[in-house]
A protein has these predicted regions:
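N-terminal auxiliary segments of SAM/dcSAM-dependent transferases
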Residues: 5-20, 24, 28, 60-151
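Conserved alpha-helix/loop element of class I SAM-dependent methyltransferases that forms part
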Residues: 173-195
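Conserved class I S-adenosyl-L-methionine
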Residues: 195-205
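A short glycine-rich, Lys/Arg-flanked "PGG" loop and its adjoining helix->strand segment in the class I
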Residues: 281-293
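A short SAM/SAH-binding and catalytic strip from SAM-dependent methyltransferases
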Residues: 265-278
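Conserved beta-strand signature within the Rossmann-like core of class I S-adenosyl-L-methionine
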Residues: 294-301
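A short acidic, Gly/Pro-enriched loop at the edge of an enzyme's catalytic core
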Residues: 254-266
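Class I SAM-dependent methyltransferase SAM/SAH-binding core
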Residues: 200, 210-255
Length: 303
C-alpha cells in the first residue's frame, strides 16, 4: 500500500496551493537540517561555557540547559524559525481544506449514510472532553483536535491527515509504510501464528493507522477509539471511502467501557505522547483488563 493512499476524503490542492506547501516543506527541511543541526555546537561552545563561568560547574538538568540555551540569540532565532515553519505549514494546508470543506462534509454524509456501510460510528453527545486535549491546539493544528462545527463537520480530521502527510513527508517518516503497516509487519514477524479476531486501536485519530489492520486481518472485528468527534467522523468516512469496515467510538483511553477480556490485540500509534502520565498509566491498566488470555498489547510512539 502507498504510504499516503489516495482516497475521496483526502483534500486535493490546486497548483498554487501545492507550490506554497512545497515551499513550506523546503523551509522546514532547511531549518531542521542546517539550523537545528547547529544547536549541539551552540551548546558545547557557547551556552555551556557561559553556564560554567557563572556557576563553576556544568548544567545538571534539562531545565538548566534550557535556561542557558534560551538566553542565546542563535537559539532564539532557531526557535522562532521552527515555530514559524510549523505555522506556515498549517496555513498552507488550510488554503486547501477551507476551499474543500463543503465538499468534504457532503462526502462524509454520502459515505456514512450509504446502505453499503461496512463500519459504524458511535459518538457521545455528553462526552467529557479531557482539558489537556480541548484547551490546546496540539502541534499548532488550527482549532486543535477537538474543534467541532456541527453534525457533518470533518475538518479536524482533514487537518490531521492532510497536514500530517505534509509534516511526515518532510521528516522522511514512513516513506514506504504507514505506522499501521509497520505495526502489522512487526506482528507478523514477531508472532507469525497470531491471528487476532478482535482489535482495538486507542487514539485512532483519522484512522490511517487503523485501516491497515482490516487489510491484514480480514476476518477481524476492528475498533478505533478517540476523544474528538470531528476526527472520528472523518475517520469513519475515510474508511468507508476505502471500502474498509472499522467501528469507531468516542471513548476515553483510560476508561474505554468495553467488556473485560474482549480483545486479542490492543494497540496505539503515536498517541501516548499526547497523554498525561496519569492517563498513560490508566491506559496501560486498561490494556490488561481488555486483553484476552494470550492477547497482545502493542504501542509505538516517539517518546
Amino acid at each position: 500500500m502507498a504510504r499516503n493512499p489516495v482516497h475521496t476524503m483526502l483534500a486535493s490542492p490546486n497548483h498554487d496551493e501545492l507550490a506554497r506547501q512545497q515551499y513550506t516543506l523546503s523551509l522546514k527541511d532547511y531549518v531542521r537540517d542546517h539550523v537545528r543541526a547547529r544547536n549541539e555546537d551552540l551548546y558545547e561552545y557557547r551556552a555551556k561555557p557561559r553556564f560554567v563561568k557563572e556557576h563553576g560547574r556544568e548544567p545538571e538538568s534539562v531545565q538548566e540547559i534550557g535556561t542557558v540555551m534560551w538566553d542565546d540569540p542563535a537559539y532564539q532565532m532557531f526557535s522562532r524559525m521552527h515555530r514559524d515553519g510549523q505555522e506556515m505549514m498549517w496555513a498552507s494546508v488550510a488554503d486547501t481544506l477551507y476551499r474543500e470543506q463543503d465538499r468534504l462534509s457532503a462526502d462524509y454524509t454520502k459515505f456514512t449514510q450509504s446502505s453499503h456501510c461496512k463500519g459504524t460510528l458511535e459518538l457521545d453527545p455528553d462526552f467529557d472532553m479531557p482539558r489537556a486535549m480541548a484547551d490546546v491546539d496540539i502541534h499548532l493544528q488550527p482549532g486543535g483536535y477537538c474543534s467541532d462545527y456541527g453534525d457533518d463537520d470533518v475538518l479536524a480530521g482533514a487537518f490531521y491527515e492532510y497536514g500530517g502527510n505534509l509534516y511526515t513527508m518532510g521528516r522522511g517518516v514512513g516513506v514506504s509504510e504507514s505506522k499501521g503497516e509497520v505495526g502489522v509487519r512487526f506482528l507478523k514477524e514477531r508472532y507469525p501464528d497470531f491471528t487476532p479476531t478482535r482489535i482495538l486501536d486507542i487514539g485512532c485519530s483519522a484512522g490511517s493507522s487503523t485501516v491497515p489492520y482490516v487489510t491484514a486481518f480480514s476476518d477481524a472485528d476492528v475498533h478505533g477509539i478517540d476523544v474528538a468527534a470531528s476526527i472520528l467522523r472523518y475517520a469513519h468516512a475515510r474508511a468507508e471511502a476505502m471500502g474498509k469496515g472499522v467501528h469507531f467510538h468516542q471513548r476515553d483511553a483510560a476508561n474505554t467501557g468495553f467488556e473485560d477480556k474482549s480483545f486479542d490485540l490492543v494497540m496505539s500509534h503515536n498517541a501516548m505522547h499526547e497523554f498525561s502520565q496519569s492517563t498513560t498509566e490508566d491506559m496501560m491498566r486498561e490494556n490488561f483488563r481488555l486483553l484476552k488470555p494470550g492477547g497482545v498489547a502493542m504501542h509505538m510512539d516517539v517518546n
